[in-house]
């Protein structure tokens, strides 16, 4: 629905990998101090969420990546629920500030420049529409995706590389797709090479689920509640409402097939298969007997040994038993792609007013 003059708060994770002092200064130039909230701990984040909700904001933009978004929207949801009907869930969105920005791609977030942040903040206040989306619910938290196995290792290894390269000459080369590729080749693959894959059992714990083929159509019979979806070796077993992790890494090509289902991907690929098919895997175009895809709304996952886990791209230790579900209530997401392209704010707008072509702006 269209909205006029939203009251927008910006809630930033000051500890996120992509949120440096420079980024914080940039955000503070765009957002006035009374609407900017910076958290440095879980407890401080909860306190700021309570303050934001009590101040009557109807929209909250988070800054700090997918993990930050998951953390803050969970705190917002819990605070609203604790109010026993006295509070209302605001519309939520993201500013592209963190290292993991899959959600930013879905919502059309601009790059974290003065122009981009000014544009997105203005759009959130005046012209952007919202879209409904139900997220993954796991361990009481909301997230766009979560899982165990290889994806958790890749995300953790990518974060490690980003941290180690920050402030060095390698930093520009270890960001984005190149950073992911380096993490996979230099860190993740050596860790899993030669290791026996654990046996994982996945049970349907909700509405009828089904397997899908490469075309996204159902394959085989419906799997009812209590029945086994999968039992076998696992390199990765993850669910998602987004089609990937950002940087066009489309690990979940069927995430948008049904709004009332999660895409569950289970893979038992060996290292050689991953390395020789990485381009197709990255694009979401590779399918084989070692990759099994399902559409589900609630599952139970049990592993014979603990596996590395990620929730929203943040490492969460190891788990051998997990329940995943499609959240009951949808979020109202601020979709910047629906807003006007040219806005009367920001450096480019100022240049237009002076009669200067945007491409001739000084650096």
Task: Label every model-predicted segment.
Residues 1-63, 68-79, 84-86, 117-119, ...:
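ATP/NTP phosphate-donor binding region
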Residues 9-11, 19-21, 39, 78, ...:
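Catalytic core of DAGKc-family lipid kinases
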Residues 10, 224-231, 247-363:
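ATP/nucleoside-binding phosphotransfer catalytic cores, i.e., glycine-rich phosphate-binding loops
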Residues 29-35, 54-56, 139-140, 305, ...:
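Short glycine/proline-enriched coil/turn segments at helix->beta-strand junctions
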Residues 65-68, 74, 97-100, 148-151, ...:
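Short glycine-rich anion-binding loops that position phosphate/pyrophosphate groups of nucleotides
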Residues 147, 151, 238-253, 315:
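Glycine-rich phosphate/pyrophosphate-binding beta-alpha loops
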